[in-house]
């Protein structure tokens, strides 16, 4: 069976530091780092109806950008990825309702609200949720089972998430500085983003998806193996599925949470995969978004792809300038960065509980 290509025809993102601007991630660089990058002063997340207004701010501009008709939307399947879903709308004191809330509540509401195809999917695999949503959507498009996919990542503030990460001593009291020797943990963030995937490129197309892989590491209930072996295997599987070699990678979008174990595992995997001690050419450079957006957990897959697509359209790249010393973990991947010839990009996502995913995209410039 001949598989169809999968293209990212448009994307839109609303990340808390953007202050309701759905354009460029460059805006986030100007914001000072805060303990929690939050929407809470703008929209009340404790009300489900208010939560839906986030999606309006992202999806209506996306639909307009692609000039999608009601008929187009009816042929579009929804793939939603999130860690906490609508837990923020469960009122304090209603703990029993927390466990009765349906996991597809948001996806059903969105499908009805925008007239999408009635077949919708929800993914909640920790920090890989929306990355897995993107992976599965692309597979259904490539095999001809669906025509179009609207892939959404969303994450909203809720006390359960904050207290959970605090109890594990994973939250930084200062800032998120991934891979730095002095890193002290993550900063949580909120955001909503959407990708529109199809088998045919449009004038707005920015990326072509080459492949991806996802797998669960049984090493621990909370984290992946720190030697990076499972992460390296997932990336290898991703490259195999995309039919490319590690030497074809021009840029790596790192997961980069700034937690001690996660950064170490990712660094070990990439160092092994790109064999930095033996290769004669410099390994591919890295790019990280969490220092600017915070860690948006299950939404980070789609948010970071959308932000990269935005950077690509503006020819703006964000070097990890916080990696300044040769004893920082990813130093070999920082030296000699050159973003001018980026073509093939590896996106890494590694989740709580050991669910790991990797995706490969090719920059699309109107020709194959």
Identify the role of each PLM range.
Residues 130:
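Short conserved active-site loop signatures built around small residues
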Residues 140-141, 312:
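Hydrophobic pocket-lining residues that define ligand/cofactor binding sites across diverse proteins
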Residues 1-118, 158, 167, 171-187, ...:
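Conserved "HGTGT" condensation-loop signature of ketosynthase/thiolase-family condensing enzymes
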């Amino acid at each position: 069976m001949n598989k169809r290509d999968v293209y990212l025809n448009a994307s839109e993102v609303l990340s808390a530091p953007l202050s309701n601007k759905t354009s460029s991630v460059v805006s986030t660089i100007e914001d000072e780092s805060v303990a929690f990058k939050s929407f809470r002063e703008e929209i009340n997340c404790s009300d489900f109806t208010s939560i839906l207004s986030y999606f309006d701010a992202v999806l209506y501009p996306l639909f307009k950008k692609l000039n999608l008709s009601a008929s187009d939307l009816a042929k579009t399947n929804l793939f939603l990825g999130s860690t906490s879903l609508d837990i923020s709308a469960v009122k304090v004191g209603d703990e029993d309702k927390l466990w009765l809330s349906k996991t597809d509540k948001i996806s059903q509401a969105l499908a009805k609200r925008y007239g999408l195809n009635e077949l919708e999917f929800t993914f909640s695999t920790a920090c890989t949720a929306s990355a897995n949503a993107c992976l599965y959507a692309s597979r259904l498009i490539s095999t001809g089972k669906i025509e179009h996919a609207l892939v959404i990542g969303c994450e909203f503030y809720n006390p359960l998430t904050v207290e959970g990460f605090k109890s594990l001593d994973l939250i930084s009291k200062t800032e998120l500085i991934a891979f730095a020797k002095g890193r002290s943990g993550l900063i949580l963030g909120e955001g909503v983003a959407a990708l529109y995937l199809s088998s045919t490129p449009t004038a707005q197309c920015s990326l072509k998806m080459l492949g991806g892989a996802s797998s669960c590491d049984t090493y621990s209930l909370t984290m992946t193996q720190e030697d990076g072996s499972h992460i390296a295997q997932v990336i290898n599987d991703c490259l195999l599925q995309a039919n490319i070699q590690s030497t074809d990678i021009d840029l790596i979008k790192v997961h980069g949470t700034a937690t001690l174990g996660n950064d170490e595992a990712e660094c070990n995997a990439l160092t092994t995969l790109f064999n930095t001690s033996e290769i004669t050419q410099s390994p591919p450079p890295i790019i990280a978004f969490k220092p600017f957006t915070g860690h948006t957990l299950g939404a980070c897959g789609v948010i970071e792809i959308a932000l990269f697509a935005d950077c690509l359209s503006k020819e703006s790249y964000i070097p990890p300038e916080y990696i300044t010393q040769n004893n920082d973990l990813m130093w070999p991947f920082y030296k000699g960065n050159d973003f001018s010839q980026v073509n093939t990009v590896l996106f890494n996502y590694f989740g709580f509980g050991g669910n790991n995913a990797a995706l490969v995209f090719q920059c699309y410039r109107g020709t194959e």
